[in-house]
Regions:
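BTB/POZ-protein C-terminal extensions
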Residues: 1-32, 36-40, 46-60, 79-80, ...
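Non-membrane alpha-helical segments in proteins
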Residues: 31-33, 39, 69, 88-95
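Short, well-ordered secondary-structure elements
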Residues: 60-76
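Alpha-helix N-cap/N′ positions at the starts of helices
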Residues: 65, 85-89, 119-120
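A short alpha-helix capping/helix-loop junction motif
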Residues: 85-86, 103-110
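Solenoid-repeat scaffolds in large eukaryotic assemblies
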Residues: 90-93, 105-106, 136-137
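Amphipathic alpha-helical repeat scaffolds
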Residues: 91-95, 110, 114, 122-126
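Ankyrin-repeat interhelical turn detector
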Residues: 98-101, 132
Length: 262
């Protein structure tokens, strides 16, 4: 804690003379609020019992716009309509609400983030995974395949990371099945390749490095066809198409939802 700086500007909404604790945003705005409200509405912002806070200022990492919204959810008043704000502002508020466990804000942010999924699927997926919202995790589980194992380890809670790795492993098995199929094409259908035939197969296999690529297999094959001037090996193309319409489709149908691993 520290004292008020000369350059600090006091929030117009949160500048009451009877406040008993002050917070400073990262952009130098002071919010003078009441400990009683913090104790009721938040587990992460209320000071310990018996501490004196009137003359102290607590610096937070959030900006003034985010704290302005966050503190409004700690007072008995009509709450701001979050549908009128840009997505980044909503996402910043959602993170702050989770960080400081402001329950009233957490619930409304969850609802608004779900509504934002069609326009911001990856960001909503990361929010759901970081904070363990099972309904949004299932809704965005295919997007979760785009997360690298390193990012997942660094970003997710331990129980969510374990669930993600088990879900991801199902897709790794499918990816291994695909590459095993491509190595046996010549065994099941002996034939020869010209240069363009080889280019097509190399382009397809080279593009399927991570599980997320399996969802784009059709467009990957189309891109490979263009790369080899539409000269495609009939046997290889049929094998890939059969695997996609058979093994891949069946594997996805019997796959467990991400939330099943929580």
């Amino acid at each position: 804690m520290e004292g008020q700086a000369p350059s600090d500007r006091v929030s117009d909404r949160f500048g009451k003379a009877d406040s008993d604790i002050s917070f400073r945003s990262c952009d130098g705005i002071l919010f003078k609020v009441h400990c009683a409200n913090l104790k009721v509405c938040s587990e992460g912002l209320s000071p310990p019992e018996g501490t004196t806070t009137e003359a102290e200022v607590v610096s937070l990492t959030e900006d003034g716009a985010t704290l302005e919204l966050l503190f409004q959810h700690m007072y008995p008043q009509r709450q701001p309509d979050l549908r009128k704000f840009e997505f980044k502002q909503l996402a910043d508020l959602a993170e702050a609400a989770e960080k400081y466990q402001v329950y009233t804000a957490m619930e409304i942010c969850h609802a608004r983030m779900e509504e934002a999924y069609p326009q911001h699927p990856f960001e909503v997926m990361m929010y759901a995974m970081k904070h363990g919202y099972a309904d949004l995790m299932d809704k965005s589980e295919l997007k979760a395949l785009e997360v690298s194992p390193t990012t997942a380890f660094e970003s997710f809670k331990p129980e969510v990371y374990i669930a993600w790795t088990r879900y991801y492993a199902q897709w790794l098995d499918l990816l291994a099945s695909f590459h095993n199929m491509t190595t046996t094409i010549f065994v099941h259908s002996p034939h020869s390749h010209n240069n363009n035939h080889s280019i097509w197969l190399m382009c397809v296999c080279g593009s399927l490095i991570r599980p997320a690529a399996l969802l784009k297999l059709h467009s990957i094959c189309d891109a490979a066809t263009r790369a080899c001037n539409s000269e495609v090996c009939f046997y290889c193309k049929r094998s890939v198409d059969d695997w996609r319409d058979g093994e891949l489709k069946q594997g996805m149908e019997r796959m467990k939802k991400l939330s099943n691993f929580l």
